[in-house]
Amino acid sequence: MEKYRDAYSTRDIEQVRLIEGQAFSLGYVRTFADPLPAGQSIDIALAFPSGLNPIISISGLCAGNAIGYLYENAVMTGGTSLPIIKRNRASTISSQGVALVGPTVTSLGTLVLQEILTGGVGKKGGGGEAGGNNLILKGLTTYLFRLTNADQNNNAQAAEIILSWNE
């Protein structure tokens, strides 16, 4: 124990950002009562100002087969403002990002990431699948996060996209 005397504690940078009030999340869910029809998508547009390059964590979930996409420099209009949640609920700091759900997409832009989520496959299929990824986004760039229900039997499925980041 003597060697730890006067030692400084260390914290993960993610935890530091959370404590400082620089951690944010948003999400959109299609519930079991209001599932995402086969072939349709949840679309979320997200953008940040110049000079802000957030480290973002992407999580997607679908009760059946789905494909998740991330596009950079997508062109969209309209949509509904999506609230960005402060992960430190005591913080007074607001996110500098802007998010929309359900925009009209006129150009997908460049495909950055694609992930297949398989749900309910085989004898031991669990009925759902989650996937995720982390990356650093660029400021002054519009990103489109898309989760498409790819159910081959034309079944609607519960689905969600959750995005979390530090600024």
Task: Describe each model-derived feature in a short phrase.
Residues 1-7, 17-167:
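Beta-strand-centric surfaces of beta-sandwich/beta-rich domains
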